[in-house]
């Protein structure tokens, strides 16, 4: 949407996203480092913009308030998602998501960790799977996420996406 709150589950919500993270991702798309079928139509436009334009776009969307998501009321899904997000699973090499994305999913803007609270389920699912398959490979943060996501099953990814979609402060 025009306020950065996507109505499609496959498209990310940009509203309220950390400015540094948005800027970096726009730069990756512009430079052709990050590829995504949904962004193919926008990439040529991004290539006409300078750094100041990208910073302005990132600031624009980061200043909007993200809409609140509603997690599916599935007890097993919520239990798995809650456990992984808050505490991780050290036996599987999965640290708590709160370590980088914070308790309420607001991320860490100084470190460049994205906000995940209220993010679209479809987008979260496809992103975690892209990290797991190493299809998404832009920067050091991607390497960190790849090493975590490779240890997640499809069911755990679904549970995490559902849990994060329902996070709010």
Regions found by a protein language model. Name each.
Residues 7-14, 29-73, 109-115, 133-159, ...:
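Axial heme c-ligation environment in periplasmic c-type cytochrome domains
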Residues 1-4, 57, 94-103, 160, ...:
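The canonical Cys-X-X-Cys-His
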Residues 19, 86-98, 113, 117-126, ...:
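Sequence context surrounding c-type heme c attachment/ligation sites in exported
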Residues 70-91, 96-106:
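Extended amphipathic alpha-helical interaction segments
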Residues 1, 9, 39-42, 81-88:
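Sequence context of c-type cytochrome heme-c attachment sites
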């Amino acid at each position: 949407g025009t306020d950065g709150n996507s109505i499609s589950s496959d498209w990310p919500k940009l509203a309220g996203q950390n400015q540094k993270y948005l800027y970096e991702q726009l730069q990756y798309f512009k430079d052709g480092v990050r590829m995504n079928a949904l962004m193919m139509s926008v990439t040529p436009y991004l290539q006409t913009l300078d750094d100041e334009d990208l910073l302005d776009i990132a600031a624009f969307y980061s200043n909007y308030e993200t809409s609140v998501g509603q997690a599916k009321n599935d007890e097993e899904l919520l239990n798995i998602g809650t456990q992984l997000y808050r505490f991780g699973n050290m036996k599987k090499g999965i640290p708590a998501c709160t370590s980088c994305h914070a308790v309420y999913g607001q991320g860490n803007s100084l470190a460049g960790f994205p906000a995940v609270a209220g993010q679209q389920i479809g987008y979260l699912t496809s992103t975690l799977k892209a990290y797991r398959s190493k299809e998404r490979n832009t920067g050091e943060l991607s390497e960190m996420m790849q090493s975590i996501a490779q240890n997640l099953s499809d069911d755990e990814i679904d549970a995490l996406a559902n849990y994060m979609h329902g996070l709010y402060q």
